[in-house]
């Protein structure tokens, strides 16, 4: 198997998505699924003027990049009834979902979220993809955004630019899963349902927070980082990526993919080389630091939308032995929590992007989900 093939398999099992599908900045670009999922959809940008962050910092212009597939449909009252927004994980983009394994299983004709019936919205979060981010030029002077800022921006993209006043469903993976909970208590009537996958609705602590802190410290403590004003990639980013790999990987998946010493060395080197070639250190820092004040747990009683909450037993980011998902799900009477058992089809934390594993649960949820 080639290094490229190994890398594609590896990236599919991790929460961080490949950014090979780049954005068309400045102009909307439309293609159809017939051209291949990697080129599907309409891309565009919404520029918010004088955006104020929770920190009090401001940007004169905040660019929000997005991809849409399908057409919004309104009822007699003008309420959009078929919009589904899917929120990506840390380091990913909206177009991360445009793969055969994901879009082909969900958006294709006759599939669960057939884009002929649904209006699919795939935003790039602040600091990610084609949206405004530190590497655009401000570097470490970029505003210190949080998940609350990212959700506020998503809401403005929908309501002010796309003219979507209601969502049938909000899906989210990893960071997007956490954004889903923030959406649920910040805009509780905006959606019919939530489908957050691979997170917990509580502050990031314990091993999860420790690894994130070590990864960020690996960059900040590197003299080559130069306070964010580096001219070449600081080596500390490689150490940070190693920690990310440890956090996101799953023993069974990695043993299957790399059953020999040489294969294991080849896989990890290919992964690290690819990440170093496509990741900016400041963007990485901001993306992980954005979770610093995430904690929806005090507001769970405000979440009134039904939710299908799914984690997998081989997720090392959200290990099931902690019992946290069950504990917090019990605080939300309209939330159904499912812990997927480990199988050859699960992918650790990356199971969040494997519709073949959880698709039937989502089908049952959508079938029973009332309009609000």
Language model features: what each stretch is:
Residues 67-136, 324:
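N-terminal cap/lid subdomain of alpha/beta-hydrolase-fold enzymes
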Residues 148-168:
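Conserved acidic catalytic loop of the alpha/beta-hydrolase fold
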Residues 167-205:
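Conserved hydrolase catalytic core segment
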Residues 283-299:
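Active-site nucleophile elbow and catalytic-triad environment of alpha/beta-hydrolase enzymes
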Residues 303, 309-311:
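Short beta-strand/loop motif that positions the catalytic acidic residue
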Residues 335-372:
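Catalytic active-site module of serine/aspartate enzymes centered on a nucleophile-bearing elbow/loop
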């Amino acid at each position: 198997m080639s290094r490229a093939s190994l890398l594609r398999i590896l990236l599919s099992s991790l929460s961080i998505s490949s950014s090979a599908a780049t954005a068309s900045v400045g102009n909307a670009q439309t293609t159809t699924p017939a051209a291949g999922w990697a080129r599907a959809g309409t891309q565009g940008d919404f520029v918010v003027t004088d955006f104020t962050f929770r920190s009090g910092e401001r940007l004169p212009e905040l660019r929000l990049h997005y991809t849409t597939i399908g057409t919004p449909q309104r009822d007699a009252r003008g309420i959009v009834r078929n919009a589904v927004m899917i929120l990506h994980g840390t380091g990913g983009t909206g177009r991360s979902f445009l793969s055969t394994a994901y879009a082909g299983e969900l958006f294709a004709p006759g599939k669960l979220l057939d884009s002929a019936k649904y209006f699919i919205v795939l935003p790039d979060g602040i600091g990610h993809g084609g949206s405004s981010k530190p590497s655009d030029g401000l570097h470490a002077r970029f505003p210190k955004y949080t998940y609350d800022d990212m959700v506020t921006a998503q809401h403005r993209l929908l309501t002010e630019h796309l003219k979507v006043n209601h969502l049938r469903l909000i899906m989210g993976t990893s960071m997007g899963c956490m954004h889903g909970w923030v959406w649920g208590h910040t805009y509780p009537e905006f959606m019919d349902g939530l489908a957050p996958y691979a997170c917990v609705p509580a502050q990031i602590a314990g091993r999860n927070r420790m690894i994130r802190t070590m990864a960020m410290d690996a960059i900040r403590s590197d003299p080559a980082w130069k306070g964010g004003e580096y001219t070449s990639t600081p080596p500390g980013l490689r150490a940070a990526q190693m920690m990310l790999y440890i956090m996101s990987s799953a023993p069974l998946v990695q043993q299957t993919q790399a059953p020999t010493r040489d294969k294991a060395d080849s896989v990890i080197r290919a992964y690290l080389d690819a990440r170093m070639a496509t990741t900016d250190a400041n963007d990485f820092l901001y993306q992980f630091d954005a979770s610093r004040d995430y904690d929806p747990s005090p507001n769970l009683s405000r979440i009134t939308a039904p939710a299908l909450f799914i984690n997998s037993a081989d997720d090392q980011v959200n290990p099931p032995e902690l019992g946290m998902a069950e504990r917090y799900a019990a605080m939300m009477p309209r939330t159904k929590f499912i812990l997927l058992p480990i199988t050859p089809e699960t992918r650790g934390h990356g199971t969040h992007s494997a519709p073949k594993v959880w698709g039937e649960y989502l089908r049952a949820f959508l079938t029973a989900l009332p309009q609000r």
